[in-house]
Amino acid sequence: MASFLLSILVFFLSALVLVPQGFAEYYLNPAYRPPQTEPPVHKPPHKEPPVHKPPHKDPPVNKPPQKEPPVHKPPRKEPPTHRHPPSEDNIHF
């Protein structure tokens, strides 16, 4: 408990010593600066001419060749699979 009171006392005394020094520097008048001998020369802002940029073009894309739609062909007749021919067409009787 004694160390706690001692630390508070040291803190309070250091605050009393340091704070007025900070206030003293705060309320001082600003340092005197003599005026410049010549007024600054007004120069118009430097403008560079615009740079010509070509219009933006997309890079070429390799597209596959366009195939023409196939010509309509009649459907191929395939022989029936897994089915016996009708008996009328059977010549082996």
Curated annotation (Swiss-Prot):
Keywords attached to this entry: Cell wall, Cell wall biogenesis/degradation, Nodulation, Repeat, Secreted, Signal
Ranges of the Sequence repeats in the UniProt entry: 34-38, 39-43, 44-48, 49-53, 54-58, 59-63, 64-68, 69-73, 74-78, 79-83
Species per Swiss-Prot/TrEMBL record: Medicago sativa (Alfalfa)
Basic and acidic residues compositional bias, start-end: 46-93
One of the GO BP terms on file: nodulation
Membrane-traversing stretches: none
UniProt keyword Secreted, yes or no: yes
Keyword Secreted: yes
Disordered: annotated segments: 30-93
Organism phylogeny: Eukaryota, Viridiplantae, Streptophyta, Embryophyta, Tracheophyta
Family: Belongs to the plant proline-rich protein superfamily. ENOD12 family.
Name of the featured protein: Early nodulin-12A
Residues in the signal sequence: 1-24
Gene Ontology annotations for the cellular component aspect, listed alphabetically: extracellular region
Compartmental location: Secreted, Cell wall
Main function: Involved in the infection process during the plant-rhizobium interaction.
Tissue occurrence: More abundant in the young nodules than the mature nodules.
Span list, region 10 X 5 AA tandem repeats of P-P-[HQVRT]-[HKNT]-[DEKR]: 34-83
